């Protein structure tokens, strides 16, 4: 995603500067696991991270010129603002941002042609479709040729709104899959061609095979990223994705422990959960093949 600014100089000066200094580091370091990953023995893991955090946040004394110890006022910052074009330049994208098109006046010959065709444009304006109008067939209930034109436009907009609501209702009929996010990520990775995907590809896999996440709030994406970073079931591979001008993103793959954990948890699912899982999939016929059952 590229952002356009009227004046980029103030933002370029923020390179290698700290930001969000009021971020609560103590609360951030507590997020060792998510609620859906709260398995047996998670208390020990939380205590281990808590002890590590307490040890790292202890104030180290420093000796002053008089020989007395003073407290160090330095506080680490979690966020560092960097310019990605300087830190990780993408070789396939030489021109980072396409130039803005210049607004120039049309040639004189074109202006004369437009002035001559002005009456034709006025006559065709009434027939131009609006932004919310679609091609309606005879079976559309919102169409009535005897209505005034402005009422027909409102009816067309209402008909499109009803069709959109009908589509959302169909998506809402899909149940949520009875799997935690760690298993969803493992399912996406084990069904990839080379066993590795980036974050966006994992999102696409989940939305494609489980329609529930197509209309779910985007908070589930944050949970996916959190599990990738903190779960021992995943690790970064040595490959990078950088094509079609997109920023390079790292690839993730399953660890040996992650494969074993996914296989054991899938075989431990009850018949009721398997029934719900099958109903939540867009293509339930691929369930045995995708899950290795």
Swiss-Prot record:
PROSITE patterns: FORK_HEAD_3 (PS50039). One of its GO terms (cellular component) is nucleus. Residues 106-119 have a biased composition (Polar residues). Gene3D superfamilies: Winged helix-like DNA-binding domain superfamily/Winged helix DNA-binding domain. This is Forkhead box protein N5. Residues 104-152 are annotated as: Disordered. Residues 176-273 bind DNA. The keyword DNA-binding applies. It is found in: Nucleus. Keywords: DNA-binding, Nucleus, Transcription, Transcription regulation. SUPFAM superfamilies: Winged helix' DNA-binding domain. One of its GO terms (molecular function) is sequence-specific DNA binding. PANTHER family: FORKHEAD BOX PROTEIN R1 (PTHR46789), FORKHEAD BOX PROTEIN R2 (PTHR46789:SF2). Pfam families: Forkhead (PF00250). Signal peptide: none annotated. CDD domains: FH_FOXR.
